[in-house]
């Protein structure tokens, strides 16, 4: 959905946020983003941090993050700034928030579908409880605290720290072990009496649930979105034929939630603490994409969206109010819009890859290092380098392997060698494009793509996840095949006919329902299409450029003469 991305940008500001509210809780709450920790000289905002890095480093920021989240989850659920009510903006319990109720034409069986929370205020209050010799350090950490993100694009498995039921931190009175607020949320109003929350399997659980520790199928879909998609609407939604961040986003929901976990059911998903870590990363990936393509950094089309609690079905644009998120000036009709939150710094945060380290680039933590003095082209070069280092699965081409030592800031100062251009031979890259009308499939569902020749173990090489909403509309996804094909000994990826012949013998698809039950005879689904594509691919010439791709040659996959095969 087109509003998905701006909702993330606006609502995530609440996770580590200051809010402006009247004394009456039912009155307007303005979302400003955190106002603390801003560098007074440069105006640069602190960066959100990778949850794995925060846990590994420990220290005041980690202590306060865990303690503040635990305190937030303990706030009475009747409070509009409680964990329950803020996370409830997304789906259940389907009611108003911040004086915004259901609008005429809005759905009474849907939430607002954004993502949000508060944290900094709790952290500052906790920091004041530490002994006088520690208080300044903890106060500084509290002011710079921002929500963490889980970079599932780089490490496709649940962070170990969120699988621990209990966790130890240094509290104001010394070391303490508490119930891990990143593991699950325990509902205070269980057994549920609220309308819509007292039915279904998840209503039988007094806390959010998820799969056991589970690795995902790793692919380069996220890298391909950076390198091949130059249109905002194509990047952020799976309604178009190109690859997008929406597809891996959906895969994370289904994989973390399994068949009946909180993340699998979008009405309940926001209550799982993994939800915010997940969507903070989606926000981060989009922010990096926007830095690379600054002239396409917001959608400029009018698109159709289904009814939500605060939004009737109809056309939406970059100026559509993002209810229920009131702004503090600059939005439309008192609300944030996609246009007003395009620059994430106005909401008081940034990401490490958008910070250009000064000097040797050996900075750390979430301290502010401004990139505001760079031109858009220079920042794009820097972010392309970071994306290549993180997601291309290829080593840097220069001598310096540490990305921070090869930062753009250092290069501009003459401290780093400008990477030399190395010509590379063009080869083929392979993928499968999948499309289906959701109205023809029992939702939620997952389409799996498998490869395995005679005498080889069949392996899943990718999947397309269809969430429960929206209930209709054509969805697209693209599954890269290069990694799997590259592992096949003796297969020449540059020979299109040889690869096509191999795929005819080894490629298989299946579709399963939310409970894991296979959907039989998927060939009878009228809109379901599988298209094998090959394109000429020229690797990047240096670390600040992306590879280039030629036009796609398409081979439709279908049943012919009683078996599945590709057309010529």
Feature locations, PLM:
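Fungal secretory targeting signals
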Residues: 1-29
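C-terminal accessory segments of proteins
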Residues: 22-568
């Amino acid at each position: 959905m087109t509003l998905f991305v701006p909702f993330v940008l606006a609502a995530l500001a609440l996770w580590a946020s200051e809010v402006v509210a009247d004394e009456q809780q039912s009155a307007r709450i303005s979302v400003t983003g955190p106002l603390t920790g801003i560098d007074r000289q440069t105006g640069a905002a602190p960066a959100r941090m990778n949850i794995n890095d925060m846990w590994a480093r420990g220290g005041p920021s980690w202590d306060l993050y865990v303690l503040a989240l635990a305190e937030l989850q303990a706030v009475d659920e009747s409070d509009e700034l409680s964990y329950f009510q803020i996370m409830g903006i997304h789906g259940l319990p389907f009611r108003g928030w911040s004086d915004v109720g259901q609008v005429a034409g809005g759905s009474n069986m849907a939430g607002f579908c954004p993502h949000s929370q508060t944290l900094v205020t709790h952290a500052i209050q906790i920091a004041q409880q530490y002994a006088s010799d520690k208080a300044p350090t903890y106060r500084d950490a509290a002011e710079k605290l921002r929500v963490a993100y889980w970079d599932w694009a780089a490490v496709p498995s649940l962070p170990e720290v969120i699988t621990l039921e209990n966790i130890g931190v240094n509290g104001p009175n010394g070391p303490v072990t508490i119930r891990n607020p990143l593991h699950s949320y325990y509902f205070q109003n269980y057994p549920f009496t609220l309308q819509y929350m007292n039915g279904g399997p998840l209503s039988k659980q007094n806390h959010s649930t998820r799969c056991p520790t589970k690795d995902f199928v790793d692919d380069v879909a996220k890298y391909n979105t950076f390198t091949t998609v130059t249109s905002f609407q194509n990047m952020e939604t799976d309604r178009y034929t190109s690859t997008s961040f929406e597809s891996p986003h959906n895969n994370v929901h289904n994989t973390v939630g399994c068949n009946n976990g909180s993340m699998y059911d979008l009405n309940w998903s926001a209550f799982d603490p993994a939800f915010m870590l997940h969507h903070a990363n989606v926000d981060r990936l989009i922010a990096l994409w926007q830095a690379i393509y600054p002239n396409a950094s917001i959608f400029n089309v009018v698109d159709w969206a289904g009814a939500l609690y605060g939004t009737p079905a109809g056309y939406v644009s970059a100026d559509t109010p993002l209810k229920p998120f009131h702004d503090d000036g600059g939005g439309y009709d008192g609300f944030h819009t996609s246009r007003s939150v395009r620059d994430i710094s106005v909401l008081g945060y940034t990401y490490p890859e958008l910070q250009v380290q000064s000097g040797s680039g050996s900075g750390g933590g979430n301290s502010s290092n401004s990139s505001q003095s760079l031109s858009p082209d220079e920042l794009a070069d820097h972010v392309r380098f970071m994306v290549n280092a993180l997601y291309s699965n290829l080593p840097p081409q220069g001598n310096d392997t540490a990305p921070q030592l090869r930062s753009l800031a250092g290069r501009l100062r003459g401290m780093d060698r400008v990477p030399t251009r190395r010509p590379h031979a063009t080869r083929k890259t392979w993928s499968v494009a999948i499309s289906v009308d959701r109205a023809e499939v029992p939702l939620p569902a997952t389409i799996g793509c498998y490869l395995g020749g005679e005498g080889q173990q069949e392996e899943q090489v990718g999947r397309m996840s269809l969430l429960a909403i929206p209930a209709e509309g054509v969805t697209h996804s693209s599954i890269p095949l290069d990694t799997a094909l590259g592992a096949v000994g003796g297969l020449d990826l540059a020979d299109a006919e040889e690869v096509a012949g191999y795929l005819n013998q080894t490629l298989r698809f299946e579709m399963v329902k939310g409970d894991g039950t296979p959907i039989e005879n998927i060939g009878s689904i009228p809109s379901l299409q599988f298209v094998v594509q090959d394109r000429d691919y020229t690797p990047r010439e240096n670390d600040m450029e992306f590879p280039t791709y030629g036009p796609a040659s398409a081979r439709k996959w279908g049943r012919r003469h009683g078996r599945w095969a590709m057309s010529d």
